[in-house]
């Protein structure tokens, strides 16, 4: 079992993540992400776009069970984060959430 909060912080510290729905959609379109994480309460149109483009690019999508406020807090940000793209997992095992590792 992967501890989401721990692995997310590890990916943030040792790898590369890109925060924000717009950037996550761009990475889904380009196929540049290894995993996309979407908050449970993200707007439906954002979820649909991310899922559509990620499916075309073969990128797994993980739905975070918390809200965008909680996701932002986990990342140490003072704002909401509705989606993020994991470009490089670094030393984390975050990709296990998407079934890849």
Swiss-Prot record:
Record GO biological process: translation
Pfam families to which the protein is assigned, alphabetical: Ribosomal_L7Ae
An example Gene Ontology CC term for this record: cytosolic large ribosomal subunit
UniProt KW DNA-binding keyword: no
Family: Belongs to the eukaryotic ribosomal protein eL30 family.
PANTHER family: RIBOSOMAL PROTEIN L30 (PTHR11449)
Name listed for the protein in its UniProt record: Large ribosomal subunit protein eL30
